[in-house]
Amino acid sequence: MTSSPIFWLATSVVFGVYLTTLYPSVAGGDSGELIAESCHLGTAHPPGYPLFTLVSWGFTQMLGPLLGGTPAWRSNLLGAMFDTISAACVFLCVEEWLRPGPSQLVRFAAPAFARIAGAVAAMGLFALSPLIWMYASHAEVFAMNNALIGCIVFLSIRFGRTKSPRVAELGAFMCGLALTNQHTAILYEGE
């Protein structure tokens, strides 16, 4: 993880942008069903999205008195938080990929400024792309999927550099979590 103030500033800006475009209530698509099922720990249409339902239920119920708003707004806020995490993972992936070190992943060592500038640019392009931004504005399983896959990609890059068993174990755990959210995660985990 980075302690760079630029990382935290860029992450805050992305979250702020997402907050300004957040749906105030139920959006279209599966959003209404997912919000309703997470309010009473039900099962949405197949495959059911158990991780999303549990996390959304916990977020809306436990933080409800603190955050205020309707369960729909709180579920939409959760989507914005997940896509902010996925954008932060893009930053971390680019920074890690270009970092110099003993087990360097690329043939050149990018200077710190270029590494950070590239990470901010990649984060911004990802976060503000139309599809990512759309799913950050309302409750949908894709925002959580983006965050989980972003973590898996970052951990894969980190493992390529460090060969740490702890990173591999965390990556395996994240792979399992991703499969309980969205079945398309298998496409990232298959190799």
Label each region the model flagged.
Residues 8, 77-108, 148-155:
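Transmembrane-helix motifs of polytopic, lipid-linked glycan transferases
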Residues 37-41, 122-124, 167-181:
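Membrane-interface alpha helices of multi-pass inner-membrane proteins
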Residues 98, 103, 109-113, 136, ...:
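Membrane-interface transmembrane helices that cradle and orient dolichyl/undecaprenyl
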Residues 169-170, 184-191:
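Transmembrane-embedded, aromatic-rich helix segments that form part
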Residues 1-17, 85, 95-96, 109-120:
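Start-transfer (signal-anchor) and selected internal transmembrane alpha helices
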Residues 20, 65, 69-76, 101-112, ...:
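Aromatic- and kink-enriched transmembrane "portal" helix at the membrane-lumen/periplasm boundary
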Residues 41-69, 80-81, 88, 178, ...:
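Short hydrophobic/aromatic helix or loop-helix immediately within or flanking a transmembrane segment
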Residues 22-34, 44-56, 73:
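Extracytoplasmic catalytic/substrate-binding loops of multi-pass membrane glycan-assembly enzymes
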